[in-house]
Amino acid sequence: MNRVFLAGGLRSHIGIRNGIFKHIRPEVLGGRVARALCQKYGLQGPDALICGNAVGPGGNIGRLLLLEGGLPERVPAFTIDLQCASGLAAIHMAALSIMAGEWDVVLAGGAESASLQPQRRYADNDERSSLRNPVFTAAQFRPGEYGDDAMLLGAERAAKAAGITREEADEAALLSQERAKKAAEEGWLKDVILPLFGSSRDEALRKRMSEKLLARAPRVTDFPEGILTAANTCTINDGAAFVMLASERWLRERDLVPSAEIKGFSMIGADSALPPLSADLAVSLLLREKGLFYSDLDAFEYNEAFAVISADFRKKHRDVADRLNRWGGALAYGHPYGASGAEIMIHLMKILEREDGNLGVAAIPAAGGVGEAVLIHHVDEREWTEERERHTAFSIPLEVKL
């Protein structure tokens, strides 16, 4: 089975809904990022492109995006809809294809526009067309008999099940904002953000946040004893992000040093009433399969669409709580749905690189109760070079004298 590496990645800056990208179709946004990533590595086009997308108009946005980006028509491209986890699932699928030897280099990630999310209407012969409002923007995540499937209510139920208080959720939101602000000020992500349309700043980052402001934030649900507010839930966003996955052979033929090696992945079905808790369940399964403990990892990137996700992690894993979302998470940057998986993977690679880490995991909970996680190991340039030299030495034929 072939080894799979992450050569690197690029993302757009993340726009708020009806912000800087409000008129930009997701395939245009994603096409520019995909093209720039190929150009960065001197690549005309990959062997394939896999795109995550959750709220687009349908069709195959992956193929549309590829063509919008001016990449070769010979390159196959397809789209994955695993809601919030779509981009990370795209990376998972790309890794499997390279492991199997089908392709050598694949672009995987996602593109999303909450600003241009289309409205749909139930067909006349659908029993739901008789509803008072037959127009909808989001499809069902689980059957009606399971109860209300709204993500906000799922997060409230998860907070209650995990025993998360409003104060703990607000604390998680404040920490995320402070860490993201520092990362932005220090320019730690500067080389992986593609400036587009005259900007490179993530729009959702707040200029100031405090405990007092968090405490004054109004609740966003009528859930009894609910804890969710506009300040401890993520914004809805526009953005695109892609990573380049490649086989060892492809990288060595081009004398490229990868950022990380993919060491494993997991996808798990969980309680559909408590979707935010599925990310940590996926990580727990993955680490168990690999014989690892949480303490073996140097960084955890969880897509914290709701503060309950990060607050729950810190409550369960106190000894490694400081390793979660070291540069902030979705509570600060926002959540461009299908692009978020590649976005947090890019952040994870940069964190391991900057902080001399070895192992890290990216994880996302998805609507409907599916968790996705991908484990990576940072590649040290010196070790990569030494490994190549050892391989070269063993491959030199010996002169035999008779």
Enumerate the language-model features and the residues they cover.
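Conserved beta-ketoacyl condensing-enzyme motif
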Residues: 22-85, 89-93, 97-98, 102-106, ...
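Conserved catalytic cysteine-centered active-site region
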Residues: 53-103, 145-150, 208-235, 315-344, ...
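N-terminal extracellular/periplasmic Venus flytrap/periplasmic-binding protein-like
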Residues: 11, 23, 27-32, 168-253, ...
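Flexible glycine-/small-residue-enriched beta->alpha junction loops
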Residues: 105-157
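Short, well-ordered amphipathic alpha-helical segments that serve as non-catalytic structural scaffolds
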Residues: 26-41, 61-65, 90, 151-158, ...
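Active-site-proximal alpha-helical scaffold in enzymes
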Residues: 64, 82-112, 159-189, 242-249, ...
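Condensing-enzyme catalytic core mediating Claisen C-C bond formation in acyl metabolism
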Residues: 1-25, 160, 215-276, 281, ...
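Active-site pocket-lining segment
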Residues: 156, 263-332
